[in-house]
């Protein structure tokens, strides 16, 4: 990104790597200089908690508030009843109103850790406020006439689904109209002039901008973040044990800490910029470390991210537990080392095959039973998928395999 921003917020977005695209960088920059801007990100309530994949955009809202602006977290109490079809191969299962409300309550706990809510602070809204009471015929006449079906079919999120000859229901097709209407209502009710989101939401964001300009002649903007993957191509938000939840009741602070401690060397500097508030220069310095020194940077990363979500005490406790496990009979010299050849990985190796071939379990059948009963952990993360692929990235400098509470092995590449 070569644009030289004048506003603090856009400077942070560019310098730390949050920015993928913006509908009008110069106009947004000028507005941010002139005074506080209100912006929102929408979250459909499809699960009981947010996960690490949502954290990038949550940090964007946090920086937005820290640079003197007003963020809105928009809960999709209305749109969740329809379901976002973007880049999905099949229709989302429909949730009951009670389940949607339950999920929203769980998500609110996460946002409260990152944003300051109040009369002059961040706002938490629910689009059911205006969507639930819509009159369908009035909506078609007043709003639907502004949308071109030809243009909607050209958006990549829809086009990719149709190109694969996968069904797209009329219910789902309406989602992008409802999301666009959210922006119009947020501008009309709260003066919101910026929508942010992942780059997969670009089409939905542009729809909202076009609608609001047509109906209210408003100058508003959209800004997207990159869809983040790890250096080895894995999608953020997942670990060997499944989703990395931002709810302590669904994933313990210790397991959350371990997720960040196990970051691949090549990702440390980038993740420090995106998920912590350390100065950029310090992030670059830590990310440039190598060998055993990079492990200290990973601990700093884990502590900083865990502190933001769960608090400093939880981060300190997680680090202390990790030291006890790894240094006093965990992943240090006291563990029996199992060496795995690179050839063993070449043809593909599942975690079941790893356990059986290295003798950690007596057979593949025993390994499957162990996983089904929740008795296997890799680097202290529970594993539930017997088909989990074991590769060089997962093994890294050493993969701690725990069977039950007392049997531990260290798998290394020979």
From Swiss-Prot:
Binding of L-tyrosine occurs at 40, 175, 179
Location within or outside the cell: Cytoplasm
Which PANTHER family does this UniProt record tie to the protein?
A: TYROSINE--TRNA LIGASE, MITOCHONDRIAL, TYROSYL-TRNA SYNTHETASE
Q: Which GO terms describe its cellular component?
A: cytosol
Q: Which GO terms describe its biological process?
A: tyrosyl-tRNA aminoacylation
Q: Which organism is it from?
A: Paracoccus denitrificans (strain Pd 1222)
Task: Kindly state which keywords UniProt assigns to this record, in alphabetical order.
Answer: Aminoacyl-tRNA synthetase, ATP-binding, Cytoplasm, Ligase, Nucleotide-binding, Protein biosynthesis, RNA-binding
Q: Name one GO molecular function term.
A: ATP binding
This enzyme's EC code(s)? 6.1.1.1
Motif 'HIGH' region in this chain = 45-54
- Could you say which residues bind ATP here? 238
The UniProt entry annotates the motif 'KMSKS' region at 235-239
User: HAMAP family per the record?
Assistant: Tyr_tRNA_synth_type1 (MF_02006)
Where does the record place the S4 RNA-binding domain? Answer: 349-414
Residues that span the membrane, as ranges: none
Question: Which reactions appear under catalytic activity for this entry?
Answer: tRNA(Tyr) + L-tyrosine + ATP = L-tyrosyl-tRNA(Tyr) + AMP + diphosphate + H(+)
Cite the PROSITE patterns for this sequence: S4
> What's the subunit arrangement here?
Homodimer.
State the name under which the record lists this protein: Tyrosine--tRNA ligase
Family, per the entry? Belongs to the class-I aminoacyl-tRNA synthetase family. TyrS type 1 subfamily.
Q: What does this protein do?
A: Catalyzes the attachment of tyrosine to tRNA(Tyr) in a two-step reaction: tyrosine is first activated by ATP to form Tyr-AMP and then transferred to the acceptor end of tRNA(Tyr).
């Amino acid at each position: 990104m070569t644009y030289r921003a004048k506003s603090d917020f856009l400077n942070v977005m560019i310098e730390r790597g949050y920015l993928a695209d913006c509908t009008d960088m110069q106009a947004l920059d000028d507005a941010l200089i002139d005074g506080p801007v209100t912006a929102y990100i929408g979250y459909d309530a499809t699960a009981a908690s947010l996960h690490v994949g949502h954290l990038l955009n949550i940090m964007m809202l946090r920086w937005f508030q820290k640079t003197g602006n007003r963020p809105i977290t928009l809960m999709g109490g209305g749109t969740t009843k329809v379901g976002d079809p973007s880049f999905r191969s099949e229709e989302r299962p429909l949730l009951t109103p009670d389940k949607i409300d339950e999920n929203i309550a769980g998500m609110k706990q996460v946002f409260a850790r990152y944003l300051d809510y109040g009369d002059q602070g961040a706002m938490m809204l629910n689009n059911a406020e205006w969507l639930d009471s819509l009159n369908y015929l009035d909506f078609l006449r007043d709003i639907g006439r502004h949308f071109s079906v030809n243009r909607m079919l050209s958006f990549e999120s829809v086009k990719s689904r149709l190109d694969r000859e996968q069904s797209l229901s009329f219910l789902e097709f309406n989602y992008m109209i409802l999301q666009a209407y959210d922006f119009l209502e947020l501008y009309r009710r709260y003066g919101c002039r910026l929508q942010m989101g992942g780059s997969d939401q670009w089409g939905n964001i542009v729809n909202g901008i076009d609608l609001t300009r047509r109906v209210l002649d408003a100058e508003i903007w959209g800004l997207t973040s990159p869809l983040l993957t790890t250096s080895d191509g894995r999608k953020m938000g997942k670990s060997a044990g499944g989703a990395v939840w931002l709810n302590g009741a669904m994933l313990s602070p210790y397991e959350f800490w371990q997720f960040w401690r196990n970051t691949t060397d090549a990702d440390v500097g980038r993740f420090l910029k995106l998920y912590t508030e350390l100065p950029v220069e310090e992030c670059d310095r830590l990310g440039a470390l190598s060998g055993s020194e990079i492990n200290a940077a990973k601990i700093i990363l884990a502590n900083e991210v865990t502190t933001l979500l769960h608090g400093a005490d939880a981060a300190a406790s997680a680090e202390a537990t990790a030291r006890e496990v790894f240094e006093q009979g965990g992943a240090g010299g006291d563990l029996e080392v199992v060496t795995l050849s690179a050839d063993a990985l070449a043809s593909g190796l599942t975690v079941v095959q790893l356990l059986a071939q290295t003798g950690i379990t007596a057979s593949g059948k025993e390994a499957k039973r162990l996983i089904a009963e929740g008795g296997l952990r890799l680097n202290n993360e529970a594993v539930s998928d017997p088909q989990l692929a074991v590769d060089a990235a997962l093994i890294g400098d050493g993969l701690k395999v725990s069977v039950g509470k007392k049997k531990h092995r260290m798998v290394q590449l020979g």
